[in-house]
């Protein structure tokens, strides 16, 4: 068996959630491979709308295995709120959601660092969501991160060391902050996380494939926000392209099957960065109004413009897209 990958071909917000909603019934497993709570997938199930930040979209299908892979960064406080809201609406997930031990944790100080770094940039701001994504991936790459699996071993010591490092940086930036409420909610989230099944996602997914199970890998954001292939430095901090499914889940490249590339009939972008086809007139405003172009997580108004076929061709190339799906053509 091979894994299929679903991803965005523009700057995110292409309508991936709706496509996932249609595709998930044919898969046994749905796995998130990158990103964090900075992006939301909007889905409709049984007449009710949901916005998922970290939890895979297969959670609404009662018989699916859902996996949060090692490439994801997880905020325990936001995860707890998201999971409890799902459970309250009749979607239990403790038995059906598996979390990679290798996924990195977003600490309260990561969120404060995110705000401090953005403030220090002045006019050169990237326009982050302030969820601590960048600082968390920075710690991951510099080998200073705290992972989900660390919750089970010497957690207090590892957390204290990371927190102390961050506080030194914040001191050097002369950034004022209050950690009390953030840390309280975060520690409650850590206790909540302990109820879930922690796995080595690379082994789990490959074993499921050996057993003949079908797997859909779910990406967040879009190709033009990829840390390597996007409009750097106005990008996210993870690999949003198809190859990210390999590194974010532990799947070999020759295991990739179909690659679903999602794009809109026009383009949108949130935050700063180049946008060649952007519209600054009433046409752009009308597209935004008719398309309800506001961020699912941030609520920020999206910049709107004509479809960029040059950028779309590039995204198809770097992802090896096998199936193109156009959204909002109506």
Label the model's feature ranges.
Residues 1-330:
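Non-transmembrane, aqueous-exposed alpha-helical and coiled segments at domain scale
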């Amino acid at each position: 068996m091979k894994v299929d990958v679903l991803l965005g071909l523009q700057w995110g917000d292409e309508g991936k959630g709706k496509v996932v909603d249609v595709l998930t019934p044919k898969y046994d497993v749905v796995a998130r491979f990158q990103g964090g709570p900075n992006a939301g997938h909007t889905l409709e199930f049984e007449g009710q709308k949901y916005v998922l930040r970290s939890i895979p979209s297969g959670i609404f299908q009662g018989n699916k295995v859902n996996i949060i892979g090692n490439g994801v960064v997880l905020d325990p406080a936001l995860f707890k709120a998201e999971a409890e809201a799902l459970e309250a609406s009749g979607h239990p997930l403790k038995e059906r959601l598996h979390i990679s031990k290798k996924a990195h944790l977003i600490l309260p100080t990561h969120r404060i660092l995110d705000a401090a770094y953005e403030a220090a940039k002045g006019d050169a701001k990237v326009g982050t969501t302030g969820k601590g994504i960048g600082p968390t991936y920075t710690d991951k790459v510099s080998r200073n991160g705290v992972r989900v699996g660390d919750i089970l071993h010497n957690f207090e010591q590892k957390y204290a060391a990371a927190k102390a490092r961050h506080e030194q940086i914040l001191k050097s930036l002369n950034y004022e902050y209050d950690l009390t409420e953030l840390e309280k909610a975060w520690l409650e989230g850590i206790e909540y996380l302990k109820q879930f099944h922690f796995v080595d996602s690379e082994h789990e997914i490959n074993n499921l494939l050996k057993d003949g199970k079908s797997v859909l890998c779910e990406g967040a954001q879009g190709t033009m926000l990829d840390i390597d292939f996007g409009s750097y430095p106005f990008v996210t901090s993870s690999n949003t392209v198809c190859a990210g499914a390999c590194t974010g889940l532990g799947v070999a490249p020759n295991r990739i099957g179909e690659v679903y590339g999602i794009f809109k009939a026009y383009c949108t972008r949130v935050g700063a960065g180049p946008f060649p086809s952007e519209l600054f007139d009433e046409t752009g405003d009308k597209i935004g109004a008719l398309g309800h172009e506001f961020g699912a997580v941030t609520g920020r108004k999206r910049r709107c413009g004509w479809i960029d076929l040059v950028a779309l061709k590039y995204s198809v190339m770097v992802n090896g897209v096998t199936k193109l799906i156009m959204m909002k053509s109506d």
